[in-house]
From Swiss-Prot:
Beta-alanine binds at residue 61. The reaction proceeds by a bi uni uni bi ping pong mechanism. GO terms for biological process: pantothenate biosynthetic process. InterPro entries: Pantoate_ligase (IPR003721), Pantoate_ligase_C (IPR042176), Rossmann-like_a/b/a_fold (IPR014729). This is Pantothenate synthetase. It catalyses: (R)-pantoate + beta-alanine + ATP = (R)-pantothenate + AMP + diphosphate + H(+). Gene3D superfamilies: HUPs, Pantoate-beta-alanine ligase, C-terminal domain. Coiled coil: none annotated. The keyword DNA-binding does not apply. It comes from Azobacteroides pseudotrichonymphae genomovar. CFP2. GO terms for molecular function: ATP binding; pantoate-beta-alanine ligase activity.
Length: 280
């Protein structure tokens, strides 16, 4: 596995691969890799001739400078994990200057998609995500790019970005990877105490149980019941829970509004904020 830090180096390495019409799989990450990332990389390796993982802590998607400063930067450990667990070919670990070399930063408009849920609570976040992903796509020019379904709103934004820019890349979602108790894997989980981590499995268990009440309870009743159940757990506070159309992210008010219904939730456990989702 080769570690590359400049755009020129990467594009030189990929030139021969493209000339031979070999498929390139790409997994963009911010590092602090866990088993969820590893599963994405394994899929990329299996489905493509060459697999590339980018490790880049993107400053434009952080609303809080302290969050940016505190975000773990563990390149050596990440590369070691990739070597141990996957047959990945390249790691692209550029500097901020390498990615944002030009001063003109493109602004993206995603309309309703970026004004609800995570977008409402983190203004500008998805524009920052789009800025870095669009740049990485133009540098790597992958055939396929892999994203986890845990960040469902982000996945929807990325699909829209590809359409807006008319990019020739296939976006491949990967099911959320979970702990045995149902907790969705996240880099933030390391901040949970053992007791909090054990209780955190109740988020997905509660969502799963709520799915059985589809068409029995009204949308509003199901949302309120789910919120109340989770808020009853010590140290838990639901920030939002909404049932949305999986394509448009529009809130639904009736089970007949769409056949593709996704329940999206954000929960604080103490000071740790977790997100999850489930399809109804």
């Amino acid at each position: 596995m080769e570690i590359i830090k400049t755009v020129v180096e990467l594009q030189t390495a990929l030139l021969k691969i493209r000339e031979q019409n070999k498929s390139i799989g790409f997994v963009p990450t911010m590092g602090a890799l866990h088993r969820g990332h590893i599963e994405l990389v394994k899929q990329s390796v299996v489905e493509n001739t060459i697999s590339i993982v980018s490790i880049f802590v993107n400053p434009t998607q952080f609303n809080d400078k302290n969050d940016l400063l505190k975000y773990p930067r563990t390149l050596n450990a990440d590369c070691k994990l990739l070597l141990q667990e996957t047959n990945n070919h390249f790691v692209f670990a550029p500097s901020v200057e390498e990615i944002y070399s030009e001063t003109n930063i493109q602004q993206f408009k995603f309309g309703h998609l970026e004004t609800v849920m995570e977008g409402k609570l983190r203004p500008g976040h998805f524009n920052g995500v789009a800025q870095v992903v669009s740049r990485l796509f133009k540098i790597v020019k992958p055939n396929c790019a892999y994203f986890g379904e845990k960040d469902f709103q982000q996945l929807t934004i990325i699909r829209t970005l590809v359409r807006l820019l008319n990019l020739n890349v296939k976006i491949i979602p990967h099911p959320t990877v979970r702990e045995p108790n149902g907790l969705a894997l996240s880099s933030r989980n390391i901040h949970l105490t053992p007791k909090q981590k054990k209780n955190a499995g109740m988020i997905f268990k509660t969502l799963s149980k709520s799915r059985k009440e589809k068409n029995i309870l009204s949308i509003q009743e199901l949302k309120q019941k789910t919120i109340n159940k989770i808020n009853c757990i010590p140290d838990f506070r639901v920030e939002y829970f909404d049932l949305v159309d999986g394509n448009t992210l529009q809130s639904i008010t009736d089970w007949k509004d769409t056949k593709y219904i996704v329940g999206c939730i954000a929960v604080y456990i103490g000071e740790v904020r977790l997100i999850d989702n489930i399809t109804y």
